[in-house]
Amino acid sequence: MTTTLQQRENANVWERFCSWVTSTDNRIYVGWFGVLMIPTLLTATICYIIAFVAAPPVDIDGIREPVAGSLMFGNNIISGAVVPSSNAIGLHFYPIWEAASLDEWLYNGGPYQLVIFHFLIGIFTYMGREWELSYRLGMRPWICVAYSAPVAAATAVFLIYPIGQGSFSDGMPLGISGTFNFMIVFQAEHNILMHPFHMLGVAGVFGGSLFSAMHGSLVTSSLVRETTETESQNYGYKFGQEEETYNIVAAHGYFGRLIFQYASFNNSRSLHFFLGAWPVVGIWFTALGVSTMAFNLNGFNFNQSIIDSSGRVINTWADIINRANLGMEVMHERNAHNFPLDLAAVEAPSIKG
């Protein structure tokens, strides 16, 4: 009898926990994805803050030349970063228990792996949680689809690119200057500016900004007047009101005359789908581009494409970019290479004595 009561009580505790996790009445929805999201994002955040403030220098290139990234070792907010794990570790999984000591783990950049793996699991589960809450509320599932764009971009630079290059030391550093260094080296080694998928991403981000500004300014300029001149326009809207707060016909008429009729949406639903889809598709393409360049399928190379009748090269902007790329390449990891990879890959000339 006692066992039966105990089992029933345990079942009730589990049922209460399940109903709490999946309840949409909570101030912040938890969800089953949230059960994994909360501890992983907390772990990533706490480790990142500690490492950014106090981590000792990391031997990122695997050549016994540690690079300092934390505030306590001479950096500021701009130059500071969590430095990627050592090239000596490569793609090996490097948790704390794989190191001989905590000092060794820190020296080889263990915190970087801890942060990015927990962060990636955290953002994957955040995306799942968006779907889960939409499902519970009977909404359509496109919020998590839109969020998949930045998730794909983060996965590309923190996971796919290091896998393709053979080492987590090639992942993006977790800091401001480190991010710019990553971008410059990426251009030097992969010519990303000449990759069509990056171009589509630029069109997505800049176009999305343009369309967002256009939409916001058009709506704000065609609000239905509900207030006096001395009151804020914002008081003219009551949360949950049934009436439209702006005149879409006026906005359509204005923009249709400013450009031409068919450049202006006359359907609010298709308009907002377009506003969501444009930047998302662009960022998808950029993430796909980075993921292919990870395996050295690089941007277009038009170096020395134009030659005169005598066979002399007529330099174009492509050759200027190539010179810049070589300059950036010889400057990065200065003590790890004697030559940029492009020059080192050329077969040495034979020497006849």
Swiss-Prot record:
UniProt catalytic activity: 2 a plastoquinone + 4 hnu + 2 H2O = 2 a plastoquinol + O2
SUPFAM superfamilies, A to Z: Bacterial photosystem II reaction centre, L and M subunits
Posttranslational mods: Tyr-161 forms a radical intermediate that is referred to as redox-active TyrZ, YZ or Y-Z.
Annotated site (Tyrosine radical intermediate): Y161
Protein location: Cellular thylakoid membrane
Transmembrane spans: 29-46, 118-133, 142-156, 197-218, 274-288
GO cellular component: photosystem II; plasma membrane-derived thylakoid membrane
InterPro entries reported in the protein's UniProt record: D1/D2, Photo_II_D1/D2_sf, Photo_RC_L/M, Photo_RC_L/M_CS, PSII_D1
Residues binding a quinone, per UniProt: H215, S264, F265
One of the protein's GO biological processes: photosynthetic electron transport in photosystem II
Alphabetic keyword roster: Calcium, Chlorophyll, Chromophore, Electron transport, Herbicide resistance, Iron, Magnesium, Manganese, Membrane, Metal-binding, Oxidoreductase, Photosynthesis, Photosystem II, Thylakoid, Transmembrane, Transmembrane helix, Transport
Site, Stabilizes free radical intermediate: residue positions: H190
Superkingdom, natural source: Bacteria
Binding site residues for Fe cation: H215, H272
Site positions (Cleavage): A344, A345
Subunit structure: PSII is composed of 1 copy each of membrane proteins PsbA, PsbB, PsbC, PsbD, PsbE, PsbF, PsbH, PsbI, PsbJ, PsbK, PsbL, PsbM, PsbT, PsbX, PsbY, PsbZ, Psb30/Ycf12, peripheral proteins PsbO, CyanoQ (PsbQ), PsbU, PsbV and a large number of cofactors. It forms dimeric complexes.
Any further remark recorded for this protein: Cyanobacteria usually contain more than 2 copies of the psbA gene.
General function of this protein: Photosystem II (PSII) is a light-driven water:plastoquinone oxidoreductase that uses light energy to abstract electrons from H(2)O, generating O(2) and a proton gradient subsequently used for ATP formation. It consists of a core antenna complex that captures photons, and an electron transfer chain that converts photonic excitation into a charge separation. The D1/D2 (PsbA/PsbD) reaction center heterodimer binds P680, the primary electron donor of PSII as well as several subsequent electron acceptors.
Family: Belongs to the reaction center PufL/M/PsbA/D family.
Cross-referenced NCBIfam families: psbA
Record's protein name: Photosystem II protein D1 2
Native organism: Trichodesmium erythraeum (strain IMS101)
Designated gene of the protein: psbA3
